[in-house]
Amino acid sequence: AYPEFAREELSRAVRIPTEGPISDELAEILQMVADHPDVYLNTGHVSGPEVMRILELAEEFKIHKVLIAHPARQQLSIEQQKDAARRGFFLEGCLVDWLYPHAPRTHYYVEKKYMDRSGDLPRMRRSAAQWMADIREVGPEYFVLGTDYGIRAAPSAVQGMRTLITTLLDYEFTPDEIRTMTAHNPARLIGLDPL
């Protein structure tokens, strides 16, 4: 998605093997998270098979707080999402997964040479209705909602959250369910008392 970044930086990235032994660097990261139970592990923007391996490794390292980034975008099946929820992991519900311009853009890096080309990649696009049905099927009690807005090419995070909450209400999520996903679950994830 970032051709120039990939050429310059990818060789330094910590790899997540989908099977077999892991690198010392990955083991060190997982152990650091395990040693600090107040910290949660975010799977990051990786593939579906890599997500499933991270979850397996999190259990192996006894990491109890994990947030699966963009499960809809990672093309995790609904069964994989439900399995992750049953295992006690949170799933991220993010507005950009269904409402965002997918044209090339600069946001993480201001230099044009680092332009995000992810909009050019073929991928399954989920509609708002599909996304809402997935949240309903897995269960709001397992989701942490956000927008990923606020970057240069998107509206503000506040505008995004307003859109997200309005859409949830339109799809008949209750105020209590919305509060669970926007306040209660995030508080649990970072170790605060439920709000």
Identify the residue ranges that each predicted region occupies.
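Divalent metal-binding pocket/active-site signature
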Residues: A1-E79
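Mid-to-C-terminal alpha-helical segments outside catalytic/metal-binding sites
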Residues: Q159-L195
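Catalytic core of soluble alpha/beta enzymes
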Residues: V51-R53, L67, A72-P104
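A structural motif corresponding to the C-terminal end of an alpha-helix
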Residues: E28-V39, D134-E141, Y171-T174
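Short acidic/histidine-rich active-site segments
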Residues: C94, V138-A157
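Charged helix-capping and loop-helix junction motifs
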Residues: S23-A27, R123-Q130, Q159-L164
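Active-site gating loops and adjacent loop-to-helix segments of metal-dependent hydrolytic enzymes
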Residues: A1-E25, G88, L95, H102-S118, ...
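Hydrophobic faces of well-ordered beta-strands that scaffold small-molecule active sites
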Residues: L41-T43, V66-A69, L91-G93, F143-T147
